[in-house]
Amino acid sequence: MTLEEQILKATDPALTTENWQFILDVCDEISADPERNIPAAMRIFKQRLAQKDANIVLRLLTLLVAAGENCGSRMQQEIASLAFLKDSLLARLGDRKVHKELKFRIAEVIEQLDKSFKKDPSLKAVADAYAKVRLKYPQYLKLPPSKPAKTEMTVQDRKN
């Protein structure tokens, strides 16, 4: 099976959840020949991210994080490129046609990549992208749940 077929299988719109076996197969294929497969994978990633089907994009975002964390520094460099971050991820946050839940997931992925790539200063573009998300699109960053307010028990509550 070719790399493209594996990526299409891992991001199939019929999948309702991530299939980690398919995702790991893609990561293994990319790692088998990074010089040839990373540029090909990034080309396909860009095409899949531009799809209108939210299911495809959601599966691809998970695959993108997995590839960034498992396919080595060359893949990280490609993901951290300004062109990819700006054109494929940040542009979707400003697009009114993109569903709100998808925007939450894109912001979450940028945050996750920022945490994963923090140790490498050459990947600073991801930190810059995350800073831009925090500044321009804070509504898409999930805040921790607020603590419920404490209320004093009434006499009636104590009787029950």
What spans do the regions from the language model cover?
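Eukaryote-specific intrinsically disordered, low-complexity regulatory regions enriched
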Residues: 1-160
